[in-house]
């Protein structure tokens, strides 16, 4: 009987306090989702001309022209290139982005990954794309800040220093 009286007294006390004998559990809260990292994509263009080379091209390959569209992400550079007007014997071997203002020759900073023999001009023209997936983010940032300080340059067998060149501009 004493046991019954003790249980009854405890139940009355709990009821008087407005509580229940059940233990409350906290409501779980959802963890916040990680913030997605934005993908930076910026597109630049260059009008490629033999006359832009330093020194300018004055032989038969002076007729070569083209356009390059370069699209950057945080760590890559995609080159979309069209070259026209070249003599049938022209062989475009390599291409890249150099640091340098108009009329100033500078160091290669981002390679297009084009290698000798990768492309063949037909009727003096070619269109191709290449992507460098390992471009230096610091160089990409510098190009975005001042595209005029950078140029696209494609080289031929006859002109190892470059046959067509153009400064980058925001597309």
Annotate the PLM regions.
Residues 1-7:
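Bacterial N-terminal signal peptides that target proteins for export
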Residues 7, 12-13, 17-95, 99-171:
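Metal-centered catalytic cores of metalloenzymes
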């Amino acid at each position: 009987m004493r046991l019954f009286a003790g249980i009854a007294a405890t139940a009355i006390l709990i009821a008087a306090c407005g509580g229940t004998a059940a233990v409350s559990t906290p409501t779980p809260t959802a963890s916040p989702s990680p913030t997605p990292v934005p993908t930076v994509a910026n597109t630049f263009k260059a009008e490629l001309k033999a006359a832009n080379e330093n020194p300018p091209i004055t032989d038969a390959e002076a007729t070569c022209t083209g356009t390059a569209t370069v699209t950057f992400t945080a760590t890559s550079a995609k080159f979309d290139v069209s070259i026209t007007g070249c003599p049938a014997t022209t062989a475009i071997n390599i291409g890249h982005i150099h640091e340098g203002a108009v009329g100033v020759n500078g160091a290669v900073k981002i390679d297009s990954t084009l290698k000798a023999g990768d492309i063949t001009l037909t009727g003096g023209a070619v269109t191709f794309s290449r992507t460098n997936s390992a471009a230096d983010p610091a160089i990409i940032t510098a190009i975005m800040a001042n595209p005029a300080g950078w140029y696209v340059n494609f080289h031929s067998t006859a002109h190892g220093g470059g046959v067509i060149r153009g400064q980058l501009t925001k597309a």
